[in-house]
């Protein structure tokens, strides 16, 4: 949950959370960033795009109906 954080705070939080999730052999995680103005979502997606290029994650997608819609991002590890 990165609600209320700046993009820099969210990226720092996500970096550790993704590492911990990989160590725990989780298949995916859900990042709650909220809908708001979309700035936090955009920052999270830019960071995840970098991680995908570095092959640290397999991919990511917007949440679907019932998952949180555009207020969450699902990260496939």
Specify the residue positions occupied by each region the protein language model found.
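Long, charged, low-complexity intrinsically disordered regions
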Residues: 1-77
């Amino acid at each position: 949950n990165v609600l209320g954080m700046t993009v820099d705070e969210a990226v720092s939080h996500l970096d550790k959370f993704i590492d911990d999730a990989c160590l725990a052999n989780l298949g995916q995680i859900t990042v709650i960033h909220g809908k708001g103005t979309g700035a936090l979502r955009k920052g999270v997606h830019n960071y995840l795009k970098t991680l995908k290029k570095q092959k640290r994650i397999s991919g990511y997608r917007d949440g679907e109906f019932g998952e949180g819609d555009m207020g969450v991002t699902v990260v496939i590890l």
